[in-house]
Amino acid sequence: HQFEVLGTRLITTFSNNILNNNGFLRRTRPDGLDDRRDMQFMQNGRQVFKQVVPMVSDLIVDHCADEGIDPTGLKRLWLHQANTSMNDFIGKKVMGRVPEPDEQPNILQDYANTSSAGSIIAFSHHQDGLESGDLAVICSFGAGYSAGNVIVRKR
């Protein structure tokens, strides 16, 4: 399989809904402060969901618009593989309908959350069925928040 990269786009925005409360630095202090779980990675999952879904779907839709592509015509969405519900909402916002399973592959059941590699693993395993000229998106996103989007065309 060969693909042409038509465009890339990145976005980063700050959020207090995913953070580390100085926990990793506490371990290095000479005064021996206790290793407190409440000072480590914290995530407000509902708020993350509410902020990331529109951020990522807008990134994809706006990127497609800037490239002259109608996102409802995308043949495949290879999205970050951490939360199926989040991907389903993003897919629906981007495609204007609920994507079919082959249009938005899910690899969580086989690989779990592999961080930003999930979209590339999905891309690697789910290229069949695309024809020359078909347009697709690879999009990874995560904590902070950061997202990267790649629009590709099958050769």
Model-derived features: positions:
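Short, functionally important structural connectors and interaction interfaces within domains
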Residues: 33-34, 40, 61, 100-106
